[in-house]
Every structure is written in structure tokens, then in C-alpha cells.
Amino acid sequence: MTPFGEAVRKLRARKGVSQKEMAAALNVTPAYLSALEHGKRGTPTFDLLQRIAGYFNIIWDEAEELFLLARFSDPRIVVDTSGLAPEYTAFVNRLAARIRNLDAVTIGELSMVLENAGKRG
């Protein structure tokens, strides 16, 4: 499950609706909504994100967070390292090869490193 999928599932639970009910209201298939929640589809379109925010009648801050989660929830991300130094390509490939074996603590630590690196540059 992706961060976006988890957020949508929580919103559905809070509203007390099934995937089938939500899918009908959004004019998508229940299978598509299920795949979106489970990270088996790419990121939703901006139009669908707006419909989801409207369906749950969420405030702007919560909608903005949902949009951000969607942006970081593509389960099949491609990292383009063309034009970068060889060590960047090697790093991305090592991460891809080992990501399934990393525990939550290590993921948290790596996330903090990335967050702090963004503040420096």
C-alpha cells in the first residue's frame, strides 16, 4: 500500500463508505479504486484528486496533504540519472536492489537524511 492509498482508506473508514460506494460516486470502477489504494496503479490524475477531496469535503490543508501524498506514491518510480556522475547511478541501483530488505528504522533514517539535504541546497 502507498501513503496515498493508506490516506484514502482512512478517509473512507472515517466516512464509513465502501470502495464500491466511493467508486460509484467518483465515476471509477471499484477495481481501479482498489488498485489505487493498494499501490498497483500509478498516481491519480489531478482531476481525480480534486474529486476525491470534494467527495470527502476535506479542508484545503488536508487536500493539499492528500495531493502531496499522491505525488510521492507512484509504486513504479523511475529515477533518471542521465547526466549525473556515475556514483549517483550506482547509489540509485544499490537502493533499488536493497529497498525490500530495509526495515522501518532504516527507511526513517534515510528519509531524514534526504529531508535535511533538501534544506541545505
Where in the sequence are the language-model features?
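Recognition helix of helix-turn-helix/homeodomain-like DNA-binding domains
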Residues: 27-43, 51
